[in-house]
Amino acid sequence: MARLNELYNKELVPQLMKDFNYRNIMQVPKLEKIVINMGLGEAIQNVKILDSAVSEMALIAGQKPVITKAKKSIAGFKLRQGMPIGCAVTLRREKMYEFLDRLINVSLPRVRDFKGISGKGFDGKGNYSLGVKEQLIFPEIDYDKIDKIKGLNITIVTSAKNDEEGKALLKLMGMPFRN
């Protein structure tokens, strides 16, 4: 069992039940999934960029990403419907907890001038999104094998009903929010 999952079951559930006066254990918010997305507009001109992005994403997430395609054509961007423009991974269960643990304890502290993550990334329903400017913060990525610095979006989907519950859950898991 992943370390964060154990922490959640043993310590966080009773703590959240006390803090929010839940009567039933099923009311306690929990992590549902983590979606990692890398959008690559440059893939329109050079499809080879997508291959390196897919391999890097597989190293970061620990599972093979799916290639995302354009939903509609946009002439201004020279984009046609169905063209590959990025990749995404959805993590659930053990891999989700292991990724979040690595993100909180290893990757985020490696960000330059890191003072904590913004508390404004919540969507109103308890889900949190954050952007990472470069994939080099992940220890799985070898600096010498990088051809281009790419950013990625990480969305943490919780079963929380509002932002307050979602933030409390993530804060107790160790997410370093800015005050």
UniProtKB/Swiss-Prot annotation:
The keyword Ribonucleoprotein applies. The keyword rRNA-binding applies. GO terms for cellular component: ribonucleoprotein complex; ribosome. PANTHER family: 60S RIBOSOMAL PROTEIN L11-RELATED (PTHR11994). This is one of the proteins that bind and probably mediate the attachment of the 5S RNA into the large ribosomal subunit, where it forms part of the central protuberance. In the 70S ribosome it contacts protein S13 of the 30S subunit (bridge B1b), connecting the 2 subunits; this bridge is implicated in subunit movement. Contacts the P site tRNA; the 5S rRNA and some of its associated proteins might help stabilize positioning of ribosome-bound tRNAs. Part of the 50S ribosomal subunit; part of the 5S rRNA/L5/L18/L25 subcomplex. Contacts the 5S rRNA and the P site tRNA. Forms a bridge to the 30S subunit in the 70S ribosome. Belongs to the universal ribosomal protein uL5 family. This is Large ribosomal subunit protein uL5. The gene is rplE.
